């Protein structure tokens, strides 16, 4: 599977380089034509700035993101002997999250029970708090 992936990547890289080379050649010719047709009295376009034109070298494609830095684009690799793969427990992650939730809810419930606050007392407090605030100020 990895071999096919690497081969596909190298083919895609070659296509991309060919496309860029072709595109750069068109840009070069278009730029030369545009500069030769400009009369000496006309002002340059507002978006164009006099920056030195720099195009990528042969190393251009080697350091792109999400690509491995390999010296050779594709190399035949020996096939791995099929070994026993380790398989994790299917729902292990979910079980761990459930345990965390259980412990969290148990901890919150125990705090509420220790403080002696029930839902009714909390609602009474919330209705009286604005009244207390108004009386103080």
From Swiss-Prot:
GO CC, one annotated term: extracellular region
GO molecular function: hormone activity; peptide hormone receptor binding
Biased composition (Basic and acidic residues): 69-78
Highest taxon of source: Eukaryota
Motif placement: Nuclear localization signal: 68-89
Main localization, broad class: secreted
Family annotation (Pfam families): Parathyroid
Region (Important for receptor binding): 17-28
Compositional bias annotation for Polar residues: 36-50
Entry-linked SMART domains: PTH
Region entry Disordered, spans: 31-137
GO biological process: adenylate cyclase-activating G protein-coupled receptor signaling pathway; bone mineralization; osteoblast development; regulation of chondrocyte differentiation
Modification after translation, per record: There are several secretory forms, including osteostatin, arising from endoproteolytic cleavage of the initial translation product. Each of these secretory forms is believed to have one or more of its own receptors that mediates the normal paracrine, autocrine and endocrine actions.
InterPro entries in alphabetical order: PTH-rel, PTH/PTH-rel
Compositional bias per record (Basic residues), positions renumbered to this chain: 82-92
Function: Neuroendocrine peptide which is a critical regulator of cellular and organ growth, development, migration, differentiation and survival and of epithelial calcium ion transport. Acts by binding to its receptor, PTH1R, activating G protein-coupled receptor signaling. Regulates endochondral bone development and epithelial-mesenchymal interactions during the formation of the mammary glands and teeth. Required for skeletal homeostasis. Promotes mammary mesenchyme differentiation and bud outgrowth by modulating mesenchymal cell responsiveness to BMPs.
Record text on subunit structure and interactions: PTHrP interacts with PTH1R (via N-terminal extracellular domain).
Family under the similarity heading: Belongs to the parathyroid hormone family.
Protein name (database record): Parathyroid hormone-related protein
Species: Equus caballus
High-level lineage: Eukaryota, Metazoa, Chordata, Craniata, Vertebrata
